[in-house]
Amino acid sequence: MVQKTSAWWHRPLGFVGLLVSLWLTSGCGLNRVAANRIIAAPNLQQHRMFAAWDSVWTNLLAKVTTNQPVSVMIPVGPPEASLSIMEIVPRDYHTKFVTTVTHRPDGGGSLALNWEPEPRNTFQPRGRPATIVVLHGYGMMKEAMAPWGFLLAQAGFRVLSIDLRGHGRSTGARIGFGKYETADLSQALDQLKARGLCDEQVGLLGLSYGATLALNWAARDPRVRTVVAIAPYNQPEEAIRRFADMAGGRVPTRILRGGAAAAAAKLELNWKDWSGEAGLRQLQCPVLLIGGAKDPICQPADIEALQKAAGGETKTLVLPEANHYVVGVSFKELTEPITDWFRERL
């Protein structure tokens, strides 16, 4: 049986949609209110969205395998939080994923993700399976990266998909755009290794927000041997503005800038210290940067700037027709180059 879900683009996303509503309904203190929204845990703001995604991905897991992946909760902090982490063990799940994209004349469109049975034996066992940690985008959850988890597991890797703090089933009242998350992930790796759930060294696959976090985590933890970053934003402040533009541009620039500045003050950080470039300048492990030529968030110029900032081996791959929604589910185009990259470096 084919299982399918669909998504539309050209509509407000994540905290941008919340900022839009704030702009339309509030008359004062917008910088402060916007800052609080920017750093607040998405799973505390978007209950309905997470419930809908949870239903979709739970259904996917049930169709792909009768042996449900094991999830554990790992305490991290400060600030105090617990991360929900799902293990997908290497074996043949007899599954393939097909993405169908439909474009509208107004520049919008839709995509449908199909999960289909694969009767062929596609499992590629390895001697001792290397571990790949998978990180989702802003406002998503670990189950949203399950297709990549199953594809990598079929390629012989052990996969750990993580709900970042404030996402999915993880806890934490605030997100830190890397300041909290890089420490969280290092602590989680310590505890996962102690439980026998991962190797000393790992590879990372990140999407969007998770891709930039992966670059900054790798820069701070020598146990990361390689990174595949799909559609990483470069400068956080610029990414916030671009998300607003993609949502319709209804939030004035001054509010976005003021909110971002106030958020940085609340987090006691400099946005530039947590950019994609900042991470790449510090890390030496091999990095595969993947973007879409039509992505307004991670633009081709950003991929070029990230490559120039890299201190070690770096390769880029840009899909000519992909936008920010499509690039992360371009399984036909990306499965082989991503699995080959990890095989050669783990």
State where each predicted segment sits.
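Acidic catalytic loop of the alpha/beta-hydrolase fold
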Residues: 294-298, 325
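An N-terminal hydrophobic leader/cap segment in hydrolases
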Residues: 28-122
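Conserved alpha/beta-hydrolase
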Residues: 152-171
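Hydrolase active-site cap/lid region
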Residues: 216-269
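The serine-hydrolase catalytic nucleophile loop
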Residues: 138-150
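Catalytic histidine-centered segment of alpha/beta-hydrolase-like enzymes
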Residues: 322-332
